[in-house]
Amino acid sequence: MNALAATNRNFRQAARILGLDSKLEKSLLIPFREIKVECTIPKDDGTLVSYVGFRVQHDNARGPMKGGIRYHPEVDLDEVNALAQLMTWKTAVADIPYGGAKGGIGCKPKDLSKSELERLTRVFTQKIHDLIGINTDVPAPDMGTNAQTMAWILDEYSKFHGHSPAIVTGKPIDLGGSLGREAATGRGVVYATEALLAEYGKNIKDLTFAIQGFGNVGAWAAKLIHERGGKVIAVSDITGAVKNPNGLDIPALLNHKEATGKLIDFSGGDVMNSDEVLTHECDVLIPCALGGVLNRENADNVKAKFIIEAANHPTDPEADEILCKKGIVILPDIYANAGGVTVSYFEWVQNIQGFMWDEEKVNRELRKYMTKAFHNLKNMCQSHNCSLRMGAFTLGVNRVARATTLRGWEA
């Protein structure tokens, strides 16, 4: 089952739990707008090449649409649609005043020079600039994009609309980015993990962790878990994987990766197969990379007691069923990785106010939002006797449905 089918399935289950009428259910499922554009750029050698870009604006009942832009060769309309819908429910679960959107370009960033990436980003912005806006649709970084990408979008958009720092979040600090934004998703994952573990009388410092994916989110999660006394015993990324039953020295591993660009050959751990991280003996598994990594082929072999979904849609529905039957507690993506969009909201607020927060305030507010969201999620689960995943979807869908009804859009 692909990401869009799985997301639609979860939405329909939540709609049934809430007793939504069919007209409102259909209205919430259909995207507000789907944008598909062709972006043709000259390469550095003078040849022309075209890429297809997408922006799906799913829902704006609760506020401006919000979601990242990813550069990846497998980007397609179905994937972007699924991720846009997930953003609608995620922002509602976090209780920030946004709707959901997502964008992407089907390209391989590592095959493009910096100047080619800049040209591609600027052409994409030219194609969609009149369909995004500070109070309409606010992009952010995602897989394959970063603060520099956002700087190019900001600059290109400002050529048409004047200086508009709030048009994107995840920007460089010098252009109005927020302190704490780089670590926000990983930090939010740790706050979410702490909230969940507290319900079971457990603490990070007493547990072992396996982290699949060691990019921005995985690296920050590992660093913060290590600082709290947790034992990170296995880590993987696209270059390989390392393990140490006594706990990896995360600061040393981060330095090693920065110096070499890879995890293997790290002297403080043994090499392991990357796929084995998902089934490694540990207390807490944190998938931080691509979707669909937990599936019917490997779900039976997962040994973790808790799974924290730092990635988007890392668990397919078949695996979800298997894992739940095994008694594994899964903290769903639309709550667990909401730290990034929450601090994006803080950045947007700072830009609109023209008043910057210090990092301590950003982190304090993030903890407050993540903790409050967990308790709202827990209460929804108790009210409807459902899993954490369905509790999160029900919480998000209910908030969007209420806003839609109040606006009179369901008629």
Curated annotation (Swiss-Prot):
Transmembrane segments: none annotated. SUPFAM superfamilies: Aminoacid dehydrogenase-like, N-terminal domain (SSF53223), NAD(P)-binding Rossmann-fold domains (SSF51735). It holds the Pfam family ELFV_dehydrog_N. InterPro entries: Aminoacid_DH-like_N_sf, Glu/Leu/Phe/Val/Trp_DH, Glu/Leu/Phe/Val/Trp_DH_C, Glu/Leu/Phe/Val/Trp_DH_dimer, Glu_DH, NAD(P)-bd_dom_sf, NAD_bind_Glu_DH. Gene3D superfamilies: Leucine Dehydrogenase, chain A, domain 1 (3.40.50.10860), NAD(P)-binding Rossmann-like Domain (3.40.50.720). Its EC number is 1.4.1.3. It catalyses: L-glutamate + NAD(+) + H2O = 2-oxoglutarate + NH4(+) + NADH + H(+); L-glutamate + NADP(+) + H2O = 2-oxoglutarate + NH4(+) + NADPH + H(+). Keywords: NAD, Oxidoreductase. One of its GO terms (molecular function) is glutamate dehydrogenase (NAD+) activity. GO terms for biological process: glutamate catabolic process. It is an enzyme of class 1 (oxidoreductase). The active site is at 102. This is Glutamate dehydrogenase A. GO terms for cellular component: mitochondrion. Belongs to the Glu/Leu/Phe/Val dehydrogenases family.
